A protein has these predicted regions:
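Metallo-beta-lactamase
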Residues: 22-33, 66-68, 72-76, 129-258
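Accessory terminal helices/loops
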Residues: 22, 229-231, 242-310
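Active-site HxH/HxHxD metal-binding segment of metal-dependent hydrolases
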Residues: 84-158, 163-165
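Bacterial N-terminal signal peptides
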Residues: 8-16
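Conserved beta-strand hairpin/beta-sheet module of binuclear metal-dependent hydrolase folds
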Residues: 35-85, 188-201
Length: 310
């Protein structure tokens, strides 16, 4: 009897470890943000084993004959479950996936859409230049095994270097590059002029502090100016829950104040090692991830502006 119990206990342990566990359940629920546009809005956290990367916003646009996807999410399993949820709304293939930038929480789901539909991937050339199949990007190291399984790195098929205008199934899309480093080395935002919907990627976030670890404050300010020039009623950030016309306000205020305060600190001859105690950005301390990200943003932006002033 004791031997049987021991074997049962061992089996229970083995089959509940991540490698044997059932596929991670993302519990994805699409939110309709505009006519023919649905988004899966992520939690206001960094990627972790508990959220399995579902801290990113991904969107489906329903056209007359297919779905167009704006960012595919952090894993094959996330993408598969998102498509299953959207199939309850319309039984359509995904023929085009648009990737806004190179951070892998936004595009590792491409492997599902390439495998299932041979979807055309449109996005940054940076991905092709810096990632190859077999590389273990951040999501491979953070997500649990039952969430990241089957995920592969897929090359981008079309890499625009200027504004790309697309009409797909009667819906118009403008894919607009910033043209310089902003959130990352190569960022795009997507604008639907007839729908007045703008997808910002990580050029803007709300409800949480942005991570500008690979970015440029000057480029972010340029991107915000470019996005503001568009006539939008719906604004979808790369992370954040506010998809209204005010969805860019957080990012605009944060980066504008940061720039103004850095200029003042340089004028006052503040040293690099004391800048984070001088520029605190306390107006945003109630935003998610403030403690984790704000000081680094301030420090790196200060260094950037200080050198640009020389």
């Amino acid at each position: 009897m004791l031997k049987k119990l021991s074997l049962s206990f061992v089996a229970l342990i083995i089959f509940n470890t991540p490698i044997y566990a059932d596929t991670f359940d993302y519990k994805l629920k699409p939110k309709k943000v505009s006519e023919n546009v649905w988004c899966f809005l992520g939690v206001l956290e960094g990627p972790s084993k508990s959220n399995a990367g579902a801290m990113v916003n991904t969107c489906y646009v329903k056209t007359s004959d297919s779905f167009v996807l704006i960012d595919s999410g952090p894993s094959y399993q996330y993408a598969s479950q998102a498509y299953k949820a959207m199939s309850k709304i319309a039984k359509l293939p995904v023929n085009t996936v648009i990737t806004t930038h190179e951070h892998d929480d936004h595009w590792l789901g491409n492997s599902f859409y390439k495998e299932k539909f041979n979807a055309k991937i449109v996005g940054p050339k940076y991905i092709n230049d810096h990632y190859k199949d077999g590389d273990k990007t951040r999501m491979f190291n953070v997500l649990p095994a039952n969430a990241i399984k089957d995920t592969k790195i897929i090359k981008v098929d079309i890499t625009p270097n200027k504004t790309l205008n697309m009409t797909i199934g009667g819906e118009d899309f403008e894919m607009i590059p910033i043209g310089e480093k902003a959130h990352t080395d190569e960022d795009f935002f997507i604008y639907m002029p007839k729908r007045k919907v703008l997808f910002a990627g990580d050029l803007a976030m709300n409800g949480r502090i942005t991570s500008n670890r690979h970015g440029s404050l000057l480029g972010q300010l340029k991107a915000i100016k470019m996005m503001k020039s568009k006539d939008y009623e719906v604004f979808v950030p790369g992370h954040g829950l506010n998809t209204s016309k005010t969805g860019m306000d957080d990012a605009e205020q944060y980066f504008t104040l940061l720039y103004e305060r850095i200029l003042k600190a340089i004028e006052d001859e503040v040293d690099t090692d004391e800048v984070t105690s001088v520029i605190t950005m306390d107006e945003f301390k109630d935003r998610a991830m403030f403690k984790a990200l704000n000081a680094r943003n301030v420090s790196e932006a200060f260094t950037e502006i200080e050198f640009s002033e020389d």
